Amino acid sequence: IIVMDKNVIKQIILNQQDFIGRIKLQSRNVCFEENANYVLVGIRRAGKSYMLYQHIQHLVANGHSIEEMLFINFEDERISDIRKEDLYLILEAYRELFAFQPIIFLDEIQNVEGWEHFARRLADEKYRVFITGSNAHMLSREISSTLGGRYLTKEIRPFSFSEYLEYHNIHLPQHWELSPIRADVVRLFSDYFYYGGLSEVFDIQDKKSWLQSLYQKILYSDIVMRKGVRNERSLRLLIRKLADSVMQPTAIKRLQDILQGDGTKITRDTIGSYLDYLHESYLTFGISSFTDSISQRESVKKRYFYDNGILNLFLFLPETKLLENLVAIKLYNKYGDDLYYYNKNVEVDFCVPNDGLLIQASYRMIDEATRNR
């Protein structure tokens, strides 16, 4: 049994305090209640860590000292083997450095099995705690039950286009489309359209390589390793087929037929599990037909990607699919499970029955059938 070295934890605490005190951040709108604890979840690189950095700088600007901040990134290779039995050492290490009651930030803790018991104890002992993770399983009933209502949750999504413009210091005046700023907006929208809203990609030259690396990290670390996927080839092929099928309702049986046609033996249950894994890791989400029965809604869905940049890795001549995917992202972020598509007698890309909304997404209006819809 390897026992974690407290001196390593101390070094990490001090390193993070120094780093967060110096880093310059682009502000993003997020509000935390003053005395609440939080779990932040979302796709990797959506900006969860930077939201914590921003909040720490806000706390320091409003009277706290940086020494009160206990920030641990669990993807730091120096503590990659930490176990739940070692988590108490984090507080011990901090107390040997400082006499404050710390405000605790636990970044990407989901890979420490049983982390929720430590989080529950911290809340019970009246610490203020902020936790981030890249897996929707952190919102599951089992974990929520262990946390016992002591944490509020926020899902952090990639930047919207309005946030993307703010990041680039673009503020739209009235009638902006007739002003010189229009050229900047068009240029930035093109980047956002093809490369998505994950903030770390914004200032990178080789965006496609960065997105490919991120995709491989999510696939391998958050799905293959975490879930024990034995047939990685079939999972990769499924993701490609989902990208090809964006805009189209797809049944699990149909996916099975497609995969088996490519020589992959796979059961419907396995495909169902893979789809759950993709949703939990914030790669894809699905919407159901408003006219389907409850059972059909689970088995037949239109599936989209949480970020256009990752979807675009798989596409050739991508514009039509990227546009509908971008509309789906915007609507899903706003309406969640109240968003459907409609396909009885007439096809409608998106509908929100509670608000009486019917929305059609079309990149070009040349096709007469598209205009008629």
List where the protein language model places each region.
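Hydrophobic anchor at the beta1->P-loop junction of P-loop NTPases
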Residues: L40
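Walker A (P-loop) phosphate-binding loop of P-loop NTPases
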Residues: R44-R45
